[in-house]
Regions:
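Phosphate-binding P-loop
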Residues: 21-27
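Conserved Switch II/interswitch segment of TRAFAC-class P-loop GTPases
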Residues: 135-139, 148, 160-181
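Walker A/P-loop phosphate-binding motif and the immediately C-terminal alpha-helix
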Residues: 29-65, 182
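Phosphate-binding/switch loop-helix module in NTP-utilizing enzymes
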Residues: 107-155
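Residue-level signature of catalytic and energy-coupling elements of molecular machines
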Residues: 26, 37, 63, 71, ...
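C-terminal lobe/tail of nucleotide-utilizing enzymes
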Residues: 1-17, 182-276
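Glycine-rich phosphate-binding loops of nucleotide-dependent enzymes
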Residues: 101, 125, 144, 157, ...
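Phosphate-binding loop that captures ATP/GTP phosphates
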Residues: 58-60, 64-110, 122
Length: 276
């Protein structure tokens, strides 16, 4: 597979290094990134994946948050395990057709800790890309580990990432986190599609007024400073959080959530796929 981002500075990768097996035809790869944990990055990944699938696209999620995976549980895959096809792994498929590969699908029990060092984690992410039979996929979303460290670098050097969605929350040090993400994106020559702010407010059940529990959002100022699009601001929604814990994100997610984010992902031009 070739990619226009292959001439990235600060960790240059040639197209030939994006190893893809002959049973995978992934057209676009989108990384969902946050500066720290606890901001709902995995939920945003799941929401975008669900909405893309509802629009008729073939969707996959590569869970690169190896030590803190939550994607399988969100998509109702607790207790399920990946199977093999020759030397390749087969992703698990959700009720509504979203393909998922995650470290939790390799463990005997989903509560077992993943006590792997950095190089092993990096190797697992590369295997999730090159040794998984993804089949035809229009959009592969990568649920990144928190931060912009070694594991994030592994993703950008091992996968032909076409765009980045940044997830923040109002209590984040938004400016610093966005600055780090922007710097990484520039060094890896990958465009940032925009920012999603999660937990922006809570809606009063009586009058519908938006209450900013964590204070006034700084997102508009930060987005303007770095010339980034705001892709959405999501409320705190306890019912939806409970549905994710029950593995019901695909049925519980309101129709039309994050329309700007989904449209930004859809607007990415597919890169050429070459048989390995």
């Amino acid at each position: 597979m070739g990619c226009e981002h292959a001439q990235a500075a600060g960790g240059q990768t040639s197209p030939s290094q994006f190893e893809e097996n002959t049973l995978s035809e992934v057209k676009r790869v989108i990384a969902v990134l946050s500066g720290k944990g606890g901001v709902g990055k995995s939920f945003v990944t799941g929401a975008i994946a669900t909405e893309l699938a509802r629009r008729g696209h073939k969707v996959g999620v590569l869970d690169a948050d190896i030590t803190g995976p939550s994607i399988p549980k969100m998509f109702g895959m607790s207790g399920r395990h990946v199977h093999a096809l020759g030397n390749l792994m087969l992703p698990e498929i959700s009720e509504h057709g979203v393909k998922v590969m995650s470290s939790n699908l390799l463990l005997q029990n989903e509560t077992d800790p993943v006590l792997w060092r950095g190089p092993v984690i990096a190797g697992a992410i590369r295997q999730f890309w090159s040794e998984t039979s993804w089949g035809p996929v229009d959009y592969l979303l990568v649920d990144m580990p928190p931060g912009t460290g070694d594991v994030a670098l592994t993703v950008f050097q091992s996968l032909p990432v076409d765009g980045i969605v940044i997830v923040t929350s109002p209590q984040d040090l938004v400016s610093m986190i966005v600055a780090k993400a922007v710097n990484m994106a520039e060094k890896m020559n990958v465009p940032i599609l925009g920012i999603v702010e999660n937990m922006s407010y809570i809606e009063c059940p009586d009058c519908g007024k938006k209450i900013e529990v964590f204070g006034k959002s700084k997102l508009p100022e930060v987005a303007e400073r770095y010339n980034l699009d705001i892709l959405g601001q999501l409320p705190i929604n306890p019912a939806l959080a409970e549905a994710c814990d029950k593995g019901e994100v695909e049925t519980a997610l309101p129709d039309g959530m994050l329309p700007k984010a989904v449209s930004a992902v859809e607007a990415i031009t597919p890169h050429e796929t070459d048989e390995a």
